[in-house]
């Protein structure tokens, strides 16, 4: 079971849309142009480290590479910004196109970066040079979310038609198609072993799928009463966290038993994103109420 921990009110001046936790660094961004980093360890847990203000519109997605060397931020202004976290300086600016950057994520530790636009274009860039290396031809042109498998072998996208499409990173070939929901899919993630895909949709359901099976549906998790905005799996493979829109809930699930472990309704507005700590013992959530909430495994 988890318990409610620290709360930071007014963490941003506007709603917070995205959060990532890697090493001792938590990063947040949202409706405003600013991206902030925070301490992830005690005794300075959730105290502000650095503010980056390089976008001219809201920040829709961000990621920190596994070695916590780089922070990548994707904005509605059509740019991806890469920051060097050792010097807290701008490393590269990438033009991601006129429709903006919907989701981003690092590949192969910190060598490459994946960007997905609202039109469904999947692009892979060099982190070192900022140059586009290649594109993956995606047939889903109404994408709402994207996930990269932890083994760096697949990129999954999903959107308005309720379908998940999985692509092989190296070849760009589509390797699976999952008819996951009858309504738009808002959130998507892989299990830590890359064998299961979790989807969250506008039907308030979370569904588990085996992308390598001819009958991919495994089970459904029911606990929300509104759109599922975010899904994140813990690195130890035990837990799945989900957040809702109107219901404002943060739910933590036991993956093995498929039972609800903990549920919180602490935010005052819809809860956009979640991030587990690297050791899977803590969770943070961000919301349109401009706050960051933390939750910790009971000792």
Curated annotation (Swiss-Prot):
Cross-referenced InterPro entries: SKI8, WD40/YVTN_repeat-like_dom_sf, WD40_repeat_CS, WD40_repeat_dom_sf, WD40_rpt
Cellular compartments per GO CC: Cdc73/Paf1 complex
UniProt xrefs under Pfam families: WD40
Gene that this polypeptide is encoded by: skic8
Protein's name in the database: Superkiller complex protein 8
Family: Belongs to the SKI8 family.
SMART domains given in the database record: WD40
WD repeat residue intervals: 11-48, 54-93, 96-135, 138-177, 180-219, 223-263, 266-299
Keywords noted in UniProt: Repeat, WD repeat
Record bears the keyword Repeat: yes
């Amino acid at each position: 079971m988890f318990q409610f921990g620290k709360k930071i009110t007014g963490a941003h001046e506007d709603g917070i849309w995205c959060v990532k936790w890697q090493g001792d660094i938590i990063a947040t961004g949202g409706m405003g142009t600013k991206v902030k980093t925070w301490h992830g360890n005690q005794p300075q847990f959730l105290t502000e480290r650095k503010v980056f203000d390089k976008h001219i519109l809201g920040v829709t997605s961000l990621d920190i590479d596994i070695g916590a060397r780089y922070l990548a931020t994707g904005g509605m202004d059509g740019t991806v910004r890469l920051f060097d976290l050792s010097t807290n300086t701008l490393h590269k600016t990438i033009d991601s196109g006129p429709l903006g950057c919907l989701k981003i994520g690092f590949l192969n530790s910190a060598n490459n970066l994946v960007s997905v636009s609202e039109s469904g274009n999947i692009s892979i860039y060099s982190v070192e040079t900022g140059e586009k290396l290649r594109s993956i031809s995606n047939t889903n042109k109404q994408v709402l979310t994207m996930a990269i498998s932890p083994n760096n072998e697949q990129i999954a996208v999903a959107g308005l038609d309720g379908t998940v499409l999985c692509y092989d990173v190296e070849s760009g070939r589509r390797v699976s198609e999952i008819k996951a929901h009858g309504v738009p899919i808002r959130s998507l993630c892989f299990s830590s072993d890359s064998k299961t895909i979790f989807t969250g949709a506008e039907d308030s359901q979370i569904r588990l799928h085996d992308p390598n099976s001819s009958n991919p549906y495994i089970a459904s998790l029911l606990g929300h009463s509104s759109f599922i905005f975010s899904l994140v799996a813990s690195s130890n493979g035990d837990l799945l966290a989900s957040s809702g829109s109107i219901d404002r809930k943060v739910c933590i699930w036991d993956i093995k038993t498929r039972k609800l472990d903990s549920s919180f309704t602490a935010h005052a507005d819809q809860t956009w994103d979640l991030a587990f700590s690297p050791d899977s013992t803590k969770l943070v959530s961000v919301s349109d109420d401009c706050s960051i909430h933390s939750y910790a495994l009971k000792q």
